[in-house]
C-alpha cells in the first residue's frame, strides 16, 4: 500500500496526466479512486488479444510481454513493454474496442485502471488530459499512416527492415517475429532465396539473430540507425 504522497508523485509521472495541476488531479483522484493494483509475474496473459477494451489501463511500473498474432495466422510478434505507459489507449473508443495484443506480466507490475465512463465524465473535463490524449492519438495515427507507405522500388534489405520497423514502431529494445521464410518472402514480394540471403547478411552484421522460423532483433534502435545509413 503506497502513501498518498507516493501516489500523487506516481500520478504526475503517468502519460496523459502530466501537466495537470495538483488541485485538479487531487479532485479527480478523490472522485474515481485511481487505485494502484499490483500483479505478480504470470505464465499466462493477463489481457488477451481481442479481449474487450473497457478501461483506460496505465502500466505504472514493471515490464510486460506484448504478443500479437496476425489475422491470417502466418506470423506472431513479441516485444517488451516497460512502465510507465498506457495499454492501447486508441482502442478505448471506436468501432472495434478490443485489445490488439496480449499482455503477460514479466515481473511484478502495477496498474491503475479507469473505466471508460469515468474517463468521459471526469478525466476529459481536464483540459490538459484532453490535449495529452488527442496528441497521443495523433501520434498513433501518424505511425499507422507511415506503416501504409508503399515498398515498391526498395531493395530486399530495405523491404525487410521496413517491415520490421512497421511492426515495432514504438519499440527500442529486443523484439521477435515468428514467421516462416516462405511467408516472409510473400509478404515483401520477393523470392525465398533472396529473402534468405538478405537475412543471413543482416545476421552477419549482428543486426538480427536467426533461429528456425524466428527472427530476433536484439536492438530495434540499431536496426533503425543502420537502415538510415
Where in this protein do the model-derived segments appear?
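Polybasic "coupling" helices that flank or enter modular domains
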Residues: 106-107, 124-192
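Cyclic nucleotide-binding regulatory module and flanking cytosolic helices
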Residues: 1-41, 81, 86-87, 91-94
Amino acid at each position: 500500500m503506497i502513501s498518498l504522497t507516493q501516489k500523487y508523485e506516481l500520478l504526475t509521472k503517468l502519460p496523459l496526466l502530466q501537466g495537470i495541476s495538483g488541485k485538479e488531479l487531487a479532485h479527480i483522484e478523490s472522485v474515481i479512486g485511481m487505485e494502484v493494483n499490483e500483479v505478480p509475474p504470470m505464465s499466462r496473459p493477463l489481457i488477451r488479444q481481442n479481449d474487450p477494451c473497457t478501461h483506460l489501463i496505465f502500466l505504472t511500473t514493471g515490464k510486460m510481454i506484448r504478443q500479437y498474432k496476425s489475422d491470417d495466422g502466418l506470423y506472431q510478434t513479441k516485444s517488451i513493454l516497460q512502465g510507465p505507459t498506457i495499454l492501447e489507449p486508441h482502442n478505448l473508443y471506436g468501432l472495434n474496442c478490443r485489445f490488439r495484443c496480449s499482455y503477460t506480466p514479466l515481473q511484478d507490475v502495477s496498474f491503475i485502471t479507469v473505466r471508460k465512463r469515468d474517463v468521459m465524465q471526469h478525466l476529459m473535463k481536464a483540459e490538459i488530459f484532453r490535449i495529452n490524449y488527442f496528441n497521443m492519438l495523433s501520434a498513433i495515427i501518424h505511425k499507422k499512416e507511415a506503416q501504409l507507405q508503399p515498398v515498391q522500388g526498395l531493395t530486399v534489405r530495405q523491404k525487410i527492415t521496413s517491415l520490421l520497423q512497421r511492426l515495432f514502431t514504438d519499440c527500442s529494445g529486443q523484439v521477435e517475429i515468428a514467421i516462416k521464410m516462405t511467408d516472409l518472402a510473400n509478404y515483401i514480394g520477393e523470392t525465398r532465396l533472396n529473402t534468405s540471403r538478405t537475412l543471413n547478411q543482416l545476421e552477419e552484421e549482428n543486426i538480427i539473430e536467426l533461429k528456425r522460423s524466428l527472427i530476433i532483433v536484439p536492438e530495434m534502435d540499431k536496426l533503425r540507425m543502420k537502415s538510415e545509413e
